[in-house]
């Protein structure tokens, strides 16, 4: 005969003296600590929960006196029940507002609403329209960058505050080392919290699991970029200009598709290069800023980051100013002559066919002349030898010319005739001035 257990009035509603009603507990828990669950990720009003251990600890504190065995398993089961009860459709990707610690900033009209709503990302900084000008931050940037490049940085950092890839750019800040450029990344991590992550561009391109780490992120910071040339660039280019869902993989999980809007901010001692991709598309996606040389008599301040982080509210206003300017310019960045030259220099250094085509004394452009692909490639190899350069392959050389035929007023043809009536490939519009020995 079962023994009835008299109910203790001090017991919570979800406990009957023998077991915990997980559904009832979950509902009571959600009333006290509101949560939503989107794609198996829990969200609080502060944004996504990166570590569920705190929630598990809260569950434990509530049930530990009612469970005598299997406590850890019970906590895990209740957490899964809470996720089911908190199910929500994905949050909208809001490109016109920014969720901040004390409310929502509306980008179209610059108004601020003091309310906290569930959202994909919440930045851990308060909006204060009367915040002081971030003098230490601005002084640091003036010491680090050319004045003409600071508006570009301002626009890009503002761009990173919203989940949008309309700018279709990634930013690289390049120096010789020791300038303090990576301090920018540390300040941004404090400004953006978990919406910014540290990572590696090389890893994103080459590791199929690394791209999933960009999910829900506004920014990925690579504070010591690997200088090895990328073997491929497909994923980097796709992420920078992403307009559709990307296929992501996690270990032990079936691949799935998500919207990715993370931007890249990279710091290094050289630019990002590719072994095989030397197209305009690869370089067009890059904003490259170069730092000033570190003054020989400068004494580094070990508390510089802390001093700049004390100005976060002012830095936020500064970033918003850049974002408004970018939006008004239809997401076209302000690019100084120096920054534009940086991209051109990097492009030339990775593709010496450009310099060859602008050289003198080896050939000249003449509409009524033609040259075979082999003869033109031999002239190019002679130029490389004279200039101590490595030559590209014959296939790539011809491909570069065909891709840029309009730029050089050339016409690719299959009707170049050699002695003996042999018909070969070549180009119309080139007169050779040298004839290297075969």
Predicted features by range, described:
Residues 1-2, 38-66:
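Modules that initiate DNA replication and primer synthesis
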Residues 1-38, 64-438:
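Feature primarily recognizes SF3-like P-loop helicase cores of small DNA viruses
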